[in-house]
Amino acid sequence: MIPDVSQALAWLEKHPQALKGIQRGLERETLRVNADGTLATTGHPEALGSALTHKWITTDFAEALLEFITPVDGDIEHMLTFMRDLHRYTARNMGDERMWPLSMPCYIAEGQDIELAQYGTSNTGRFKTLYREGLKNRYGALMQTISGVHYNFSLPMAFWQAKCGDISGADAKEKISAGYFRVIRNYYRFGWVIPYLFGASPAICSSFLQGKPTSLPFEKTECGMYYLPYATSLRLSDLGYTNKSQSNLGITFNDLYEYVAGLKQAIKTPSEEYAKIGIEKDGKRLQINSNVLQIENELYAPIRPKRVTRSGESPSDALLRGGIEYIEVRSLDINPFSPIGVDEQQVRFLDLFMVWCALADAPEMSSKELACTRVNWNRVILEGRKPDLTLGIGCETAQFPLPQVGKDLFRDLKRVAQTLDSINGGEAYQKVCDELVACFDNPDLTFSARILRSMIDTGIGGTGKAFAEAYRNLLREEPLEILREEDFVAEREASERRQQEMEAADTEPFAVWLEKHA
């Protein structure tokens, strides 16, 4: 089932320096909660400055949904320490509140009013809040409070030059973009390994079903928790953050221009379903527009091609201008066993897997095959640890035992690990391979199995509160290592100044500005 990458691995072993200079970054979301686990109703902590313009700490959907962002970094340890500093400072500056350590929220009542993230009075800030109003009206606020970790990854130019020859200009844009689309296609085919190993949302609180019927065979504990005994990541299931209305868009990952055209079409395609919501009611705007996507960011995807945007530029226009610059992996649940929601083992595994995805052959993928890959993902998401689980290839009927496929993949990853260790020194990547491959013979070692044992004992709420309290105490006591207190104060002041400048520079009324951007 795994493509034959022996030639590509032999090539890599002859060109180890092609992997010197991998760049990566992390984003981690987490809900602010009270000591009893209920959602915090306070505004964004003052010490964290402006959520609109702060470089490292912002908000996602809700005012209580923090998002931490590291700068691009070539050093894993430095990046994780930077992320930990962001958590340390925040833990010391959020009063008695804690950071919820799980992807799935709990203690949110059905119909509870969840305050949308607020970004001030600039047109850009009001647009961001209106976009969230649209998300709430389309999908419900509860779904938008699910948290995850995003891992951003780019291969060094040395890799592309070793692989594609001496490239520059338009030629580089085309070839590098084609290389990253290969990564994306392989990710759709084999990325289910991420929720298998690291999925950590095998259960949900009863409030999450919101009284809706479900065909999933949930088991229920006495405290009202619903779980699937072999599930890995309900966050990635249809119960979590997915968008059924997007499944017919036909966006593919074979070619830069084809992908961008599909994305641009989606933000122009009217939706009958969303038209029923209306655009405005009683003088209040309900969504940016009633198209399938309000803006490009609404496209749900487990992985995205990205380029840093310039001021006023859409993500797709940035891709057209310069091609794909990096990949955003979006399938990681919050790691409940880490105070910062992600750890070194996961980052090193993702490095290995992304390199493998760049090496393995990846035939073009039709929208039909893309839909077929979802079958494997759903199996792993809902019953990944089931003893006799099998997976298929695309739309073919042949089936293969998941443990065997996993071990075959890790045989390749071990060779990538040897190459990365040869240029970085030590055996850190090989150690990760040895630790994780054991999960295929013993699923009890996976994150989902480990966290489910705790949840069955103490419930999602009890588990979440215990971790949140322990991490709050730990982070508040730890000294900062990379950033200093004055760095945070300076960024708070600078972010507030940037927001004020944006607000002062706006001359058009929001309604007029919106007509040009909706």
UniProtKB/Swiss-Prot annotation:
What are the GO BP annotations of this UniProt entry? glutathione biosynthetic process
A UniProt-annotated Pfam family? Glu_cys_ligase
Keywords, sorted A to Z: ATP-binding, Glutathione biosynthesis, Ligase, Nucleotide-binding
Does the keyword section mention Ligase?
A: yes
Q: Which residues cross the membrane?
A: none
The terms describing its cellular component in GO are: cytosol
The protein's GO terms of the molecular function aspect are: ATP binding; glutamate-cysteine ligase activity; metal ion binding
Q: Which pathway does UniProt place it in?
A: Sulfur metabolism; glutathione biosynthesis; glutathione from L-cysteine and L-glutamate: step 1/2
Instruction: Provide the reaction this enzyme catalyses.
Output: L-cysteine + L-glutamate + ATP = gamma-L-glutamyl-L-cysteine + ADP + phosphate + H(+)
What is its EC class?
A: ligase
Record-listed E.C. numbers: 6.3.2.2
SUPFAM superfamilies the record matches: Glutamine synthetase/guanido kinase (SSF55931)
Q: Which family does it belong to?
A: Belongs to the glutamate--cysteine ligase type 1 family. Type 1 subfamily.
Under what name is this protein listed? Glutamate--cysteine ligase
Q: Which organism is it from?
A: Escherichia coli O17:K52:H18 (strain UMN026 / ExPEC)
